Amino acid sequence: MKLCGFDVGIDQPFFLIAGTCSIEGLQMSLDVAGLLKEACAGLGIPLIYKGSFDKANRSSGTTNRGLGLEAGLKILDEVRRQTGLPVLTDVHDESQVAEVASVVDVLQTPAFLCRQTDFIRAVAMSGKPVNIKKGQFLAPWDMKNVIDKARAAARDAGLSEDRFLACERGVSFGYNNLVADMTSLAEMRNTGAPVVFDVTHSVQKPGGLGGSSGGAREMVPVLARAGVAVGVAGLFMETHPDPAKAFSDGPNAVPLKHMKTLLEQLVALDRVVKTRPLLENDFSC
C-alpha cells in the first residue's frame, strides 16, 4: 500500500505516526515536529505528524478539549507547510469530514466510533487514507467487518479501496485498565489492511485519575518492542516535551527527549524481524 508517497506493509520498515495528543499551539507543534523529523530522517523512518484539535472523548466535562477545529486545522496546515511532513488528525462526526479532509493528508477515526457505519462510510468516501482504530471492546478479528465497510463505501464512490489502516490501541481489561494482546496484531493482518500499533494509548488507564485518564508511560518501550517483534506496518506514539504539563494524555505520553533513543532500539529490532520469513505464515504440522 502507498501512504503519503511511501510503501507500507508487513514487508516494509515500520512507519511512524507521532506528535502531541492535543494541538497546543503553533510553536510547540513546529518544535515537536522538527525534532521528530530530524530523529526519523536519521533512522530512515517515514513520519506522519499527528495532533488532535478536539478531544471529544473525555473523562470529565471540565477537562481541556483542545483548540477547536478551525484553529487546529490552521496549525496542522502550517506544520505541513514549514516541515514538509504529512499530517494526520481525528474526525469525530460526519459533519467534519469534508473540511478536515481538505487540509490533512490522513484521517483518523476514534476507537469508540469504529462500529458507526455511517461515520465509517463518510470517512472512507473522503478519498483520503484513514487510520481506523479498533474499539477497546472489539475482538481483533471483528476489525475485518470494519475494514470491509470502509472498502465497500470506497467502492460505491468509485475510489481506491487500498487506503485503510487497522490500528490496535488496547482492549478493556476490567475497570480503568487496558491490555495489549500481541496476538491481536497478527490477527488483524487478516483484514488485508496494514496494521498499526498505537502504543501510547495501550498503556492508558481510562478514567484512572477520577476526572482524567492515567497511564503507565514507562511501559511504552516494553510494548513498543513487543509490537515490533510481532511485526507491524506502523507505530503510533504520542509525545510531549513535558508530559506533566500536557493538555491531555500526559501520563501515557513519551517524553520527547527519549523518542530518538527509543526509535533507535525499535529500528534495530524491526530489521531483525523483517529480514526473515514470518514463521506463523507456514507453521502447519
From Swiss-Prot:
Keywords: Cytoplasm, Lipopolysaccharide biosynthesis, Transferase. The keyword Amino-acid biosynthesis does not apply. GO terms for cellular component: cytoplasm. Its EC number is 2.5.1.55. It comes from the Bacteria. Pathway: Carbohydrate biosynthesis; 3-deoxy-D-manno-octulosonate biosynthesis; 3-deoxy-D-manno-octulosonate from D-ribulose 5-phosphate: step 2/3; Bacterial outer membrane biogenesis; lipopolysaccharide biosynthesis. It catalyses: D-arabinose 5-phosphate + phosphoenolpyruvate + H2O = 3-deoxy-alpha-D-manno-2-octulosonate-8-phosphate + phosphate. One of its GO terms (molecular function) is 3-deoxy-8-phosphooctulonate synthase activity. Coiled coil: none annotated. Gene3D superfamilies: Aldolase class I. The keyword Glycoprotein does not apply. One of its GO terms (biological process) is keto-3-deoxy-D-manno-octulosonic acid biosynthetic process. It holds the Pfam family DAHP_synth_1. SUPFAM superfamilies: Aldolase. It is found in: Cytoplasm. InterPro entries: Aldolase_TIM (IPR013785), DAHP1/KDSA (IPR006218), KDO8P_synthase (IPR006269). Belongs to the KdsA family. PANTHER family: PHOSPHO-2-DEHYDRO-3-DEOXYHEPTONATE ALDOLASE. This is 2-dehydro-3-deoxyphosphooctonate aldolase.
